[in-house]
Amino acid sequence: MPPQQGDPAFPDRCEAPPVPPRRERGGRGGRGPGEPGGRGRAGGAEGRGVKCVLVGDGAVGKTSLVVSYTTNGYPTEYIPTAFDNFSAVVSVDGRPVRLQLCDTAGQDEFDKLRPLCYTNTDIFLLCFSVVSPSSFQNVSEKWVPEIRCHCPKAPIILVGTQSDLREDVKVLIELDKCKEKPVPEEAAKLCAEEIKAASYIECSALTQKNLKEVFDAAIVAGIQYSDTQQQPKKSKSRTPDKMKNLSKSWWKKYCCFV
């Protein structure tokens, strides 16, 4: 297989948040409704919360997506992710929404630990690399069954990562050596329909093409799902029709273990 862009761990010092990150209040399981990691979904004065979990094979670029989206930077060194959480406040129709991004490990050795991060997930970003046919194959063979086992109703957005490598000559040569080709966009769209994903989006963490669209779609789908969970017998709340820029007030990172 060709060399893959990876999921480097979020650097502790090199990528400083705009404002020093706040400490999470409370111990494990002690966060209240609306707090990242909290069990409640309701908002309150600080705004509502959306929990977004990124899953997919190792080295498909999950962490790169998060780092690029949250810092406008791109990590160059590949360090396999264990479990990391990132939290931010974003503005949706003028109202604050606390977005929790849970970056999970795709390696098989974490299969038993990974589902611990799935509790109260509002939206899954199921990632595969468009230049890794094996990671695409695992979408339906491994990841969808795992998600549906633990979160039968949570929405999924299928994300094709590393789209900037589709035309990369070195990558194409390496794929050809294995008698493989990049995953056709049409095949990915068909897969999204088959797994009943909310949508399919191709993006690049390096160039940031369609990167914001991925997380905007995740926030909208997460809010819709959260509303149905809170008010199953009432009509759905109005879907935000305009996604506003990410609030630059503060970012924070904390451990995902529960």
From Swiss-Prot:
Instruction: Identify the stretch(es) annotated as Disordered.
Output: 1-45
Q: Which SUPFAM superfamilies match?
A: P-loop containing nucleoside triphosphate hydrolases (SSF52540)
**Could you say which cofactors this protein requires?**
Mg(2+)
Cite the Pfam families for this sequence: Ras (PF00071)
Bias class Gly residues marks the residues at: 29-45
Query: Where is the sequence biased in composition, kind Basic and acidic residues?
Result: 10-27
Tell me the impact of changing C255S. Answer: No effect on subcellular location
Main localisation: membrane
Lipid group attachment sites (S-palmitoyl cysteine): C256
**Top-level taxon:** Eukaryota
PTM summary from the entry reads: Ubiquitinated. 'Lys-48'-linked ubiquitination at Lys-177 and Lys-248 by the ECS(RAB40A) complex leading to its degradation.
Molecular functions (GO terms)? GTP binding; GTPase activity; guanyl-nucleotide exchange factor activity; metal ion binding; protein kinase binding
Q: Which GO terms describe its biological process?
A: actin filament organization; cytoskeleton organization; endocytosis; establishment of cell polarity; G1/S transition of mitotic cell cycle; positive regulation of protein targeting to mitochondrion; Rac protein signal transduction; regulation of cell shape
Kindly state the tissue distribution recorded for this protein.
Ubiquitously expressed in all tissues examined. Expressed at high levels in the stomach, small intestine, brain, skeletal muscle and placenta.
The record ties this protein, via CDD domains, to: Wrch_1 (cd04130)
Q: How does it sit in the membrane?
A: Lipid-anchor
Q: How does it assemble?
A: Interacts with PAK1. Interacts with PAK3. Interacts with ARHGAP30 in a GTP-independent manner. In its GTP-loaded conformation, interacts with ARHGAP31. Interacts with PTK2B/PYK2. Interacts with PAK4; the interaction is PAK4 kinase activity-independent and protects RHOU from ubiquitination.
Please report the name of this protein according to its UniProt entry. Answer: Rho-related GTP-binding protein RhoU
Q: What is the species of this protein?
A: Homo sapiens
